[in-house]
Amino acid sequence: MKQFILLIICCLFLGKFLYAQQDKAVWITIKSENLKCWECKEVLEKYLIVENKSNMESGLVQWKINLLQGEIRVQYFPDRVSPDMIRTALNNAGFDADSEKAIEDAYKTIPAICKRAIDGGGPQPRKPCHIQPIQ
């Protein structure tokens, strides 16, 4: 009986030690000036879901998109994904990420409202687009 209790105690300590070695998820905030409308949010979320499963080893835990501020907060595991990989994923989806511009081919495929303001995209006067219209 003493050996059994000792074995359980050892397993608990070993389990605690192994859990302590796992990297914790961290947050990063990335500005994207052409991420202002709900359509853009849907396009980016679809892309990130596919990208997370295929190329990022499921390193993205969650993301929150603030359309009014034009930014995305991403929680990720740093042992699987780097901030540069996240910015590259945004660029490949057609969106600017901080100071890095989107890939031109991908930028051409996003909806017109998701284009940069200098290209005529984004919210128009008296036509807010940060809220999905009621259908």
Tell me the role of every PLM-derived stretch.
Residues 1-25:
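Bacterial Sec-dependent N-terminal signal peptides
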Residues 22-34:
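Short glycine-/aliphatic-rich beta-strand segments at the starts of folded cytosolic domains
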Residues 28, 67-74, 105-111:
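Surface-exposed aromatic
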Residues 32-42:
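Short, surface-exposed ligand-recognition loops at beta-strand->loop->(often short) alpha-helix junctions
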Residues 41-88:
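N-terminal, post-signal-peptide region of Sec/Tat-exported proteins
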Residues 43-46, 120, 135:
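Secreted/processed peptides and extracellular or luminal domains of membrane proteins
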Residues 94-106:
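Conserved short beta-strand edge segments in small beta-sheet-based binding/regulatory domains
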Residues 107-133:
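Short, low-order "capping/linker" segments at domain edges
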